[in-house]
């Protein structure tokens, strides 16, 4: 699976490079929520997502090695179990994440080619819905794995409040995971009923709301845990 993940990331970059050869120097680079072009930029901006995918692919490999090494070398059973759990979570999430982001890159490439012909896939109802569904699926994926992460400094919903102790970490990551899943599902469902251009807008609103509410909840959990420790002391 790890090898397949790297192959997909490399294929995404390869296809992007092939398309770039046929594109002019300046291409549509930014769209509003209705899919209309609002800015033109260098065609090499299309390389951003494929490069990020490759970095995520190889970065996840080093993270897996880090967690596996920590699980083998630590003398604490608790830390060993946490490292093994984080390695498992990372191994589960990286493939579907790479696949979804590669699909998003494919949509962007297709839309760029159409935009140069005076058309736009993203400005159509189908394009808006497809992109919203892909981003919504990514939120659902991330939200599902957040509660499975154990306290660490590399992956998860990491704030100074959430990392205070295992209780604040577990409660905050579980809540943030639920909020992201809800945002993704609401976005996917909303796009079935929303007019053209509103799918991505609604998903962006849901995502921002989920993040803000999760941060506030993390602060509340941290305050409650500090108060509980003071009462015990």
Per-range role (PLM):
Residues 1-233:
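Feature 926 captures the class I aminoacyl-tRNA synthetase adenylation module centered on the KMSKS loop
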